Amino acid sequence: MLSRATRTAAAKSLVKSKVARNVMAASFVKRHASTSLFKQANKVESLGSIYLSGKKISVAANPFSITSNRFKSTSIEVPPMAESLTEGSLKEYTKNVGDFIKEDELLATIETDKIDIEVNSPVSGTVTKLNFKPEDTVTVGEELAQVEPGEAPAEGSGESKPEPTEQAEPSQGVAARENSSEETASKKEAAPKKEAAPKKEVTEPKKADQPKKTVSKAQEPPVASNSFTPFPRTETRVKMNRMRLRIAERLKESQNTAASLTTFNEVDMSALMEMRKLYKDEIIKKTGTKFGFMGLFSKACTLAAKDIPAVNGAIEGDQIVYRDYTDISVAVATPKGLVTPVVRNAESLSVLDIENEIVRLSHKARDGKLTLEDMTGGTFTISNGGVFGSLYGTPIINSPQTAVLGLHGVKERPVTVNGQIVSRPMMYLALTYDHRLLDGREAVTFLKTVKELIEDPRKMLLW
């Protein structure tokens, strides 16, 4: 049988282990509990610390309990993207470890080949873990962060901050500096003084008495023959973002895959500009839409594609895909690069409906709010370089599409009409197409049809 002393020592050890567990639990609860529970935890922690230091006090046996489910962290993962996207680059975290985040509040932004994806927190709580750094590559399903569910900390509660160490008051600091300076002065006085060297008295003549110096040309300092200052030659290296990298890959892929060829034509914009001038104010008043050129050109392309369906088709393996719908990809320039949001079923929309959709998508693109759905698909692309002053150019096919139409600037040029030289607002059109699917005759016919519809917009009513 164990002796009484041995049993007593074992009991004390057991009590200490229970207190230690309670103290650790109290420390954990203080970081995450409500105000009332925080006070209770603080009391347990202080009492337990006293007991563990050797003083005899009574400690309640576990006055509160912590369950793993109550404080279990929520894992936040990289969300699913489009079928063609499986990874991206972490652009930034909006929170740091220890910060409180509300439910549905933005936690991180992921940059993909097409758009930026925002990741929101599914719960309210404290951020306990961030697994990546900006510019790290993240894949779908990977854990981005962990959030421990909980309420927002009340004002005045939370971990007690360590009291600042006492600092000497300014007056004390000044006195200390004065004392140190006095000690230094006394030390200097105690040191033997060196005999001062006799100073030579120098009498400077007055300005009026000073003789004027005459400098001959031979005595003048020589001027540097080469006073050229080199121009700065600095270089700055900036890492390409994922969108720019993807654009570069796709454009090169298009050049390597398609048998690209470009055909040109010019269109007289007089009738379209006159119609726009007549109805512009009325359209803005009724619909709030600015009547531009893109809606009419898009509609003209959908009508011309009915006669030349290969323009709207695609090559997939050893098959040609023909479509009875036309999804127009509209090229929009953004600070991060060129994007091509899609106007769905443009063949079924009116000119104003197309114009409205283009304006909506353009605003979303410039604000960085495009979704993957806005960017997916597209059967034919229109690029309007004329808004930037382009006169002439050859666009690149937006693979896997078959053709792209490039619009250029409207310029007044002399043209011959009925034997007379007149000035007309003219625009160059450029159609780049994949010669594997589209023959030259079909490409020229398509572009000629677009030209005729734009030069006489009333013909669109006949289709």
Curated annotation (Swiss-Prot):
It catalyses: N(6)-[(R)-dihydrolipoyl]-L-lysyl-[protein] + succinyl-CoA = N(6)-[(R)-S(8)-succinyldihydrolipoyl]-L-lysyl-[protein] + CoA. Its cofactor is (R)-lipoate. Keywords: Acyltransferase, Lipoyl, Mitochondrion, Phosphoprotein, Repeat, Transferase, Transit peptide, Tricarboxylic acid cycle. One of its GO terms (biological process) is tricarboxylic acid cycle. The active site is at residues 435, 439. Residues 73-148 form the Lipoyl-binding domain. GO terms for cellular component: mitochondrial nucleoid; mitochondrion; oxoglutarate dehydrogenase complex. SUPFAM superfamilies: CoA-dependent acyltransferases, Single hybrid motif. NCBIfam families: PRK05704.1, sucB. Belongs to the 2-oxoacid dehydrogenase family. It is found in: Mitochondrion. The modification Phosphothreonine is found at residue 340. Signal peptide: none annotated. Residues 184-212 have a biased composition (Basic and acidic residues). Its main location: mitochondrion. The keyword Phosphoprotein applies. The keyword Cell wall biogenesis/degradation does not apply. GO terms for molecular function: dihydrolipoyllysine-residue succinyltransferase activity. Component of the 2-oxoglutarate dehydrogenase complex (OGDC), also called alpha-ketoglutarate dehydrogenase (KGDH) complex. The copmplex is composed of the catalytic subunits OGDH (2-oxoglutarate dehydrogenase KGD1; also called E1 subunit), DLST (dihydrolipoamide succinyltransferase KGD2; also called E2 subunit) and DLD (dihydrolipoamide dehydrogenase LPD1; also called E3 subunit), and the assembly factor KGD4. Present with 7970 molecules/cell in log phase SD medium. It holds the Pfam family Biotin_lipoyl. Residues 185-209 are annotated as: 4 X 6 AA approximate tandem repeats of A-[SP]-K-K-E-[AV]. Binds 1 lipoyl cofactor covalently. It comes from the Eukaryota. The gene is KGD2. This is Dihydrolipoyllysine-residue succinyltransferase component of 2-oxoglutarate dehydrogenase complex, mitochondrial.
